[in-house]
C-alpha cells in the first residue's frame, strides 16, 4: 500500500465533507422511510403463500441434525419460538440439517395450522449425517410426520 501524503489527506477530507453535507438532501429526495412490522402478513413473491414479514429461524450454526437453537435444549427453544409466535411472527424456517422439526412440532401442535407458514429444507447430497428417505417426496413426507402437519408451505433445497 502506498503512502498517504498531506495532499491526498486533504482531498479525501474534502470529498468526505462534501458527501456529509449533501447526505440529508439525498435522503430527503429518496422519499419517506417505510416502517414495517415483522408480524405484517405479506405474500411470498407471487406464490400466493402468506407469511409474516419476518421468519423465526431455527438453525443458527446448524449441522449434524442440531443447531445453536436446539443445542440450548427444549425449554430454551420453546421459549424462543413461543416468544416469536406471541409477537406475531408466524413464519418458521427449519431444516432437516438443524434437527428442529421435533422441537417445532411440540410448540405448534395446538395452534391453528392456517395461522402458520412452515418452511423446511432438503439437503441435496448424500452425506453421513443425512437421513435419506429415498427422494424428495419421501423427505417431505418424513418432514410432515416429524412436524405433525399435513403440509409444508415452502420446501427449499438447502
Per-range role (PLM):
Residues 114-128, 155-158:
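A short, structured active-site edge motif that brings together acidic residues
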Residues 64-65, 72, 130-158:
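Glycine/proline-rich, positively charged
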Residues 90, 94-97, 125-133:
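Short gly/ser-rich anion-binding loops that grip negatively charged ligand groups
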Residues 2-116:
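N-terminal binding-site loop/beta-alpha segment at the start of enzyme catalytic domains
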Residues 25-30, 128-135:
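Short, compositionally biased strand/turn segments
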